[in-house]
Design a protein with these regions (language model features):
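Cysteine endopeptidase catalytic domains of the caspase/legumain-like
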Residues: 18-334
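Bacterial Sec-dependent N-terminal signal peptides
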Residues: 1-20
């Protein structure tokens, strides 16, 4: 007897001594006592195919579900200290822009945002309801988050504390060096599609909060994270004009002037974010802004020269109201 089967789009025949052929669950064909190892191979292949389909189905079911395991892959993503402190009046917005529509992507920005979220919840004691994370945020998404912060400020007044974290592209105005954040739907040669730092600072200052912390894993020279320039930027890095924060605001940025904010590929994070998290992890959050910045600046500068063969120097800008006190302030206030 000859049995005809189809596999991988091709028909073939197998000699079979027995007519005991059955179709089991999942359409698996069982062939009993054949003269050829082809039949055994066919059954084995079908087993593998069924297993593959099961895996694909499971992956499809999980699509769109953002779990920590999907993003976090380095030592700072494991063993995150858990604090007993609960900061009920601290609110955080995290923007993680990795996948751009018109520009090159920002490697590991989603890892950065997801990891910082975990530190906010576990180590800083910020309730999940007090934290918004936007992955691949458009300009409207970013404006919506600022509006949310403004509404919080109206309800809580001067008792509220805010953290604004951003990982993604920055861009300069080539005519005057003014800095912009670049949403994923923006283009670096169309300023109207960006979100200016001067506007951001003005709106954050308008919160009239007890303290506003801004953390930027971005550069504003027109360079992309890694090598090269933004697709629509000039072929030279520009020196971005430093914006001055006002009110009770502290701004820590990944790089200065015409420098680039680099990735730390081994750790699957931005270099700046990795060492920011590393210090928080090692200190269990018991670290002042002064010590935190010194650690981040030193380690980023040293590691960048080694792994990227380029300079990267984190900077800090402090509003006039915090000049004399910022070094003693902590993210984890207890």
């Amino acid at each position: 007897m000859m049995m005809v089967m189809m596999a991988a789009g091709c028909w073939f025949s197998l000699p079979v001594h027995s007519q005991r052929i059955s179709v089991g669950k999942k359409g698996l064909v069982k062939v009993m006592r054949t003269d050829s190892t082809c039949a055994q191979e066919f059954v084995r292949d079908e087993h593998q195919s069924v297993a593959t389909r099961k895996m694909a189905k499971a992956a499809g079911a999980a699509e769109g579900v953002n779990t920590l395991a999907n993003y976090l892959k380095s030592d700072v993503d494991l063993n995150i200290p858990v604090s007993k402190v609960k900061q009920e009046k601290t609110f955080a917005v995290i923007i993680a822009n990795e996948n751009y529509q018109e520009e090159v992507n920002v490697e590991f920005a989603l890892n950065d945002g997801m990891a910082f979220r975990e530190y906010c919840i576990k180590l800083l004691g910020i309730p999940e309801s007090n934290l918004h994370i936007r992955k691949d945020a458009t300009l409207n998404n970013m404006l919506a988050e600022i509006n949310w912060m403004q509404n919080i400020a109206k309800a809580y007044g001067a008792e509220a504390r805010f953290i604004f974290y951003y990982a993604g592209h920055g861009m300069p105005d080539e005519s005057n060096g003014t800095s912009y954040l670049l949403p994923v739907d923006g283009k670096s040669n169309i300023l109207a599609t960006g979100y200016s730092m001067s506007r951001l600072y003005a709106e954050l200052n308008g919160l009239n909060a007890a303290c506003v912390t801004v953390l930027m894993d971005a550069c504003f020279s027109g360079s992309k994270r890694g090598e090269g320039m933004l697709a629509s930027a000039r072929g030279v890095a520009l020196k971005a004009k430093a914006e001055a924060p006002k009110g009770n605001m502290l701004v820590m940025t990944a790089a200065q002037g015409s420098e680039t904010a680099y990735p730390y590929k081994e750790k699957k994070h931005g270099l700046f974010t990795y060492f920011l998290l590393k210090k928080l992890q090692e200190s269990k959050g018991k670290v002042t802004y002064g010590d935190l910045f010194d650690y981040v600046k030193t380690n980023v500068a040293q590691k960048s020269v080694v792994v990227n063969e380029k300079s990267q120097t984190p900077t800090i800008a402090v509003s006039g109201d915090l000049v004399s006190t910022w070094q003693g302030i902590r993210l984890n206030e207890d």
